Amino acid sequence: KNLKSSTHKEVDDDLKVVNSLVDQLAQVNKLIMSGGSKNSSPDILDARDQLLLDLSKYINFTVDYGDSNDAIVRLGNSGNGKILLEKTNKSVLTSNVQEGRLIFNISRNAINSMNNDISSGLLFGAKNFYDFVGEVESEINQLAFRLSQDFNEIQQNGIDLNGRTGMSMFSIDSM
């Protein structure tokens, strides 16, 4: 349980970084759009490109450029994913757990929706790890339950040194 909790916290921390990078990109887009496509300084464009590079460590996305050379960022690899940033309008990524699995959500203009477009990067790896830990935990619990049943059966069929029938070794009511 601690491993899942710490992984979920790590995902939430990474999402804060992602959302901060998107905020910074929105500010850079604002600077780019105020200068026009021909007047954008190379330093501003370099800053935008560095922010996009930093973002790519966490999530996969595609980028198109608007008339003013502003970045339009969509989640996923298809170019048709949900919009993370368009001009200065940004979305917010969050996570929650549903049925033991980690789910990413995207919120834009107070509209929330589930997102399945993230398929690489640190966040995707952490999500897969979280889900894997849950599956392994379930399998270990099933194995422990079966072992305790088998031990109890063997114990109950045996006789102790005083000739008494054995009693259950494990209480499996709580398993």
Ranges and model annotations:
Residues 31-175:
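Phosphate-proximal small/polar/acidic motifs at interfaces that engage nucleotide phosphates
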Residues 1-32:
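Long, non-coiled-coil amphipathic alpha-helical linker/lever segments
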